Amino acid sequence: EFMEKGIVRECEEELTEVCGRNPIILKVAEQAPRIIGLLVFRTNIQAVLCTLDMQILRTETIEFENHLTGEKLIQHAITLVDQMLECEKNILGIGIASIGPVDICNGVILNPPRFYGVRHVPIKEAIQEKYDLPVYFDHDNNCAALAEKLFGIGKAEEDFLLLAVSNGIGSGVVCGGEVFHSHRGFETELGHVSINCRGPQCSCGNRGC
């Protein structure tokens, strides 16, 4: 079916060291649809246009100004998707990864710490309505864990924990070869936990984070 749709093609490479008939090797076809990815950080939003085998064709970034709102965030996302569509119209879908906490089931960015002005943003619904394309939404660390499972050091592992350390601490869990999601659609989150109620005041307003 994928061959009929032009997504994959047979590779001419032959495996001569294998007993019996040579297996058919499939590769992503040159004319296969592309995919667009969006990554939401506290300071910027990034977009990438890539092939199905993860060859990056174009990247763009919009830095956030002061007084960011949910409406402005969605508009920035639309601007970036439009820029990607200038290069390629044949798009299979759009993936959105965001800092958390997020509501994965409903595609909503909830209330990330130190992400002032951004609360309960239905970014998945907004992008889906704008472009009429399949849209996938998840926590950024879950997406990172999936990338490690598919393309990185986790390919041979069925169970592992990804620990992301930047200006916060986050995690993604792969269990039984699949990214773990709770039944409520919320991600596993290690970051931004108060461990000393008498500690230094954090930018979130709590102490000892």
Model-derived features: positions:
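Basic amphipathic alpha-helical segments that dock to polyanions
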Residues: 1-9
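Conserved phosphate-binding catalytic cores of ATP/NTP-utilizing and phosphoryl-transfer enzymes
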Residues: 10-35, 139-160
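Gly/Thr-rich phosphate-binding beta-strand-loop-beta motif of the actin/hexokinase/Hsp70
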Residues: 22-57, 162-175
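Hydrophobic alpha-helical segments, especially N-terminal targeting/anchoring helices
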Residues: 50, 102-103, 173, 181
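Glycine-rich phosphate-binding loop and adjoining helix at the ATP-binding site
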Residues: 59-83, 87-159
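Glycine-rich phosphate-binding loop of actin/hexokinase-like ATP-binding domains
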Residues: 156-209
